[in-house]
Structure formats: C-alpha cells, structure tokens
Amino acid sequence: MTEEATGRAGDCESGDAIPASRVAGCTVGEAKTVIQRGLWFEEFEIGTTYLHRPGRTVTEADNVLFTTLTMNTQSLHLDAAWAAEQPGFRGERLVNSMFTLSTMVGLSVAQLTLGTIVANLGFSEVSFPKPVFHGDTLYAETVCTDKRESKSRPGEGIVSLAHTARNQHGDVVARAQRTTLVQKRPQR
C-alpha cells in the first residue's frame, strides 16, 4: 500500500519538527510524495489472501549466522558431517526453523504492517510440515482471519493473521497464526 498526499506549497514547511513517519505524507510545492507502508486497521479485509513477493532464497550463511546468533548449537543446523550421516536430511543441514518463522513473517511486513503495527500480541499453531534446506526459496502468503477494534486502546485495532510459507516447489514449510495490534488510519 502507498500513501499519497496532495496540497499546496507550505504543507511541510512548519517550523515544528515533523516526525519521520509523517514527512512522506506531505506535499512540497506541486510535487506529490508517496510512501510505502503497511495497511491501516480499516484496510485489512477478513478472508483476503495477501501474496508476499519477492521470495527469499536461504543461504548457508543465513542459517549459520542466525543459528549462532541465537545460541542454538544443534548439530542438525551447524555440523555438515553429522547431518550427512542422518537419514531424512538429504545429507544436508536443516535450516533453523526459527529462521524460517522469522522470514515468513518478515516477508509480510512491507505489504501488511510496515509503519502501522503497534505490537505483535502473540503466535499460536506454529508448525513446520517440511524442512527447509540451503538454496530453498521461501514465499509467504497471509490470510486476514479476524479483526476488531481495541477496547482499551482508541485509535488501534486487533488483527488476526494466518501466515503460510512455501518453498520453490510449492510445499508448505511453515504455518503460524499471529495476532497483532495495528494503528487505525490517522485522523487529519
């Protein structure tokens, strides 16, 4: 989603400091600015599937860096010789499933929540039906399953999302239900 603004010169020339999140929504002279952003609460549609592209090809460096940064020293992620001897691993190390989960959610950010999310409220029903290996490309899709206005936080709403990640063959490699707190469209 993009944010467009129209107006006349002076719209952005106030002597007051303008938050960086608002600068791109203004007009300078006759020029229109457009900012990439996620969806406001009102723009989420229950039942709509959002396809997130482009995909993300996972490298060995991604897996090793993520695994060591998060202190997960499982041999199945780090030890190539050990993994080569394990049945069902194709002779390869598995990509850390937390990297897969993080990437699945990350692929959705630009389209759904960039600059509009207040908080992740929780994840549930997380599963990894198939493993991810170095060289696999992940694609994500999200279905908005529910939304409601926040009772305790005016100007915000709760949006429930069902994320799915697939590899380059279309195999489902991850699923998760996610609940988020999202800003409503600002009142002007």
Language-model regions: role of each:
Residues 1-46, 128-137, 141-188:
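HotDog/MaoC-like acyl-thioester-processing domains
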Residues 2-4, 12-121, 187-188:
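Hot-dog-fold acyl-thioester-processing enzymes
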Residues 51-57, 127, 179-181:
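Generic structural detector for well-ordered beta-strands
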